[in-house]
UniProtKB/Swiss-Prot annotation:
Keywords: ANK repeat, Coiled coil, Nucleus, Repeat. Its main location: nucleus. It comes from Oryctolagus cuniculus. This is Ankyrin repeat domain-containing protein 1. One of its GO terms (molecular function) is RNA polymerase II-specific DNA-binding transcription factor binding. The gene is ANKRD1. ANK repeats lie at residues 152-181, 185-214, 218-247, 251-280, 284-315. Transmembrane segments: none annotated.
Amino acid sequence: MMVLKVEELVTGKKSSNGETGEFLPDDFRDGQYEAAVTSEKQEDLKTLPAHHVSLAEQQWEREKQLEAELKKKKLEQRSKLENLEDLEIIIQLKKRKKYRKTKVPVAKEPEPEIITEPVDVPRFLKAALENKLAVVEKFLSDQNNPDVCDEYKRTALHRACLEGHLAIVEKLMEAGAQIEFRDMLESTAIHWACRGGNLEVLKLLLNKGAKISARDKLLSTALHVAVRTGHYECAEHLIACEADLNAKDREGDTPLHDAVRLNRYKMIRLLIMYGADLTIKNSAGKTPMDLVLNWQNGTKAIFDSLKENSYKTSRIATF
C-alpha cells in the first residue's frame, strides 16, 4: 500500500519517487490544497462561536414549524362550506359551543318562611301590601277577621288588589273577605284593582261577583278610575264586561270627558270605538268635543302669547 508523507499531503508536491503525485487533483497541486484547507479552517473557526446561538435558533424554527403544522391541521379539520347543509351544520355547532360556554345561574328557591308567633293587625296589613303570603296565612289560620282595616278603612284586600298580589287576593277571598267592603272614600276592591292596573286581579274580582257598576264617593265607576290612571287593558276588559261607557261622576264627567281632559289618546280611541257618546254634557255644560276645542284654544293662546312676547323682545333689542 502506498504511504503518503505529511509534507506531500499538505503541500501537494510530488515525492521523489513519483508515486504519490497522482493522489491529488490537478487543482490542488503546487500548494493550492494547503491554502484551501487553511481558508476552510479559518471560516470554520469564524462560525464556531455562533454555533451555540444557532442551536437555539434551530429549536425556535422547529417549534415555529410545528406550530404552523398544527394550525394547518386544524384548518383542514374545519367544516368546509360547500352548500347550505354545511352552513346549517356550522351554525348548529356554533350554537352548541355558545350554549356550553354560557353558564345558566341556578336560582335558589327561597326557604319557606315559618311563622310561629301570633300576627297582629298592622303586620297583617303590611304583609298584604308586601306580598308576604306566609304572614297572611298565619293571621287567617288564627281565625282572625280578614276585613280588619286601617284608619282609612282600607282592608288587606284593598292593598293586595292595588299591588296586584293575586295569591294573597285569592287567599283573602277564600277566608271570606268582603269584595264590596268600602274604604273612607267608598272605593271597593274593584276600584283599587283598576287603580293598580293588574288585569288578572280585576278578572278574579269580576268572576267572584264584584259589582262592575260600583261607585265611590265621587260617583266614579271602575271604568272612570281605569281611564284616569291610564290602564288600557283594565279599561278594555271592563268595556267587554259591559261597563257603562257614559256613566257620569259627581261633576257630570263621563270616562270620555276624563280621557280628553288627560289627553289619553288610546283611551279616547277605545271609548269612541265602543260607542261612547260625544254629545253628553257635564255639569259645566261641556261635551268631550268642547273640551278638545278648549284645549286647542288654550294651547293656541299660549303660543300666541309666546309669539307676542318674542316679538316685543326683538323690537326692544333693535333699539
